[in-house]
From Swiss-Prot:
Its cofactor is Fe(2+). It is an enzyme of class 1 (oxidoreductase). This is Glutarate 2-hydroxylase. GO terms for molecular function: ferrous iron binding; glutarate dioxygenase activity; oxidoreductase activity, acting on paired donors, with incorporation or reduction of molecular oxygen, with 2-oxoglutarate as one donor, and the other dehydrogenated. Homotetramer. Acts as an alpha-ketoglutarate-dependent dioxygenase catalyzing hydroxylation of glutarate (GA) to L-2-hydroxyglutarate (L2HG). Functions in a L-lysine degradation pathway that proceeds via cadaverine, glutarate and L-2-hydroxyglutarate. The lineage of its organism: Bacteria, Pseudomonadati, Pseudomonadota, Gammaproteobacteria, Enterobacterales. It comes from Escherichia coli O1:K1 / APEC. Belongs to the glutarate hydroxylase family. It catalyses: glutarate + 2-oxoglutarate + O2 = (S)-2-hydroxyglutarate + succinate + CO2. GO terms for biological process: L-lysine catabolic process. Its EC number is 1.14.11.64. It comes from the Bacteria. The keyword tRNA-binding does not apply.
């Protein structure tokens, strides 16, 4: 099942009291909610998962769901339904999550455990070919010689969807800040499709549904090209996207010009959010109607940022939802 899903309109009011965490609208947009685990929840979670090092989560995939259940139980089983309803709700679909007391690179393993628990309450994180694990950790430094914009600090990483060059469904993306030193700038950039003023123009274009070729550079460790259109629809006919400017390969002049105009229209949108993500926090978004990117950094010889990502598919009890296949 995937994100092309209609959910019954019974989302929990963000003003409701929850057990083990708080939930409020973010300062940037009511579409983006901030979820904070209390100090007690954080400490009890870390105590109960201490017996499993990160390597155990890597080797035994069922443990990723076990730590998710532990976290949900600590939240009186209110967390899992809240996560699903928020991420599947077209009006929201995004969370900024943190746990009180997890805010230092020395706690990197604890960060991976927490993010893994949250992700596996909504689905399962896909194999990441770049890292060879279900998650990837990577570092941005002042000088970069890589073959994509992922680690390049002094330019904007344009807005995009993840999973465009793989065959696996990528319903959600999780991006966590593990470390940051000598950093200015570099906020996360987000754009909800319904806030993009040029959506209707490009969605109705004849090329919007034409399958196009997506090919990744060598660092991604993916050798097979995939073909799919830039736009699709959910069960209610609303637009969703699978797009990244770096990896789409236009076959002719017509496609190249249209993709260039599409990129310009996205990057100049007035609906873009700039979201600071402190160390220990992570963004969790619906990948099919949110685009994400990163603003540029101010140069510094000792600039360093370490990130962790997970991306995967939604999985839940089907009798509560109608799923577009």
């Amino acid at each position: 099942m995937n994100a092309l899903t209609a959910v019954q309109n019974n989302a929990v009011d963000s003003g409701q009291d929850y057990s083990g965490f708080t939930l409020i609208p973010s300062a940037q947009s009511p579409r983006l909610l901030e979820l904070t685990f209390t100090e007690q929840t954080t400490n009890r979670f870390l105590e109960q998962v201490a017996e499993w090092p990160v390597q155990a989560l890597e080797y035994k995939s069922f443990l990723r769901f076990r730590v998710g259940k532990i976290l949900d139980d600590l939240c009186a089983n209110q967390l899992q339904p809240l996560l699903l309803k928020t991420l599947l709700n077209r009006a929201e679909g995004a969370l900024l999550i943190n746990a009180v007391g997890i805010d230092d690179v020395a706690q990197a393993d604890e960060m991976v455990k927490l993010a893994t628990a949250v992700a596996h309450l909504i689905g399962r994180s896909n194999f990441d070919a770049m890292s060879g694990q279900y998650y990837a950790r990577f570092v941005v430094k002042n000088v970069d010689n890589s073959d994509s914009y992922l680690r390049q600090p002094h330019r904007v990483m344009e807005l995009h969807n993840d999973g465009t060059y793989v065959e696996e469904i990528t319903d959600y993306v999780l991006m966590m800040k593990i470390d940051e030193q000598n950093m200015q700038g570099g906020n996360s950039l987000l754009l909800h499709l319904d806030d993009w003023e040029h959506l209707d123009h490009f969605f109705r274009h004849p090329l919007a549904r034409r399958p196009m070729r997506f090919a990744a550079p060598p660092s991604k460790n993916v050798s097979k090209d995939v073909f799919h259109p830039v736009f699709d629809v959910d069960q209610q006919g609303r637009p969703v996207m699978r797009y990244i400017d770096q990896f789409v390969q236009p076959k002719d002049f017509e496609e190249g010009v249209w993709l260039s105009e599409l990129s310009d229209a996205i990057e100049t949108s007035k609906g873009i959010l700039s979201v600071p993500v402190p160390v220990g926090k992570f963004l969790l978004i619906n990948n099919l109607f949110w685009l994400h990117g990163r603003d540029r950094f101010t140069p510094h010889p000792d600039l360093r940022r370490e990130l962790m990502r997970q991306r995967g598919y939604f999985a839940y009890a089907t009798h509560h939802y109608q799923t577009h296949q």
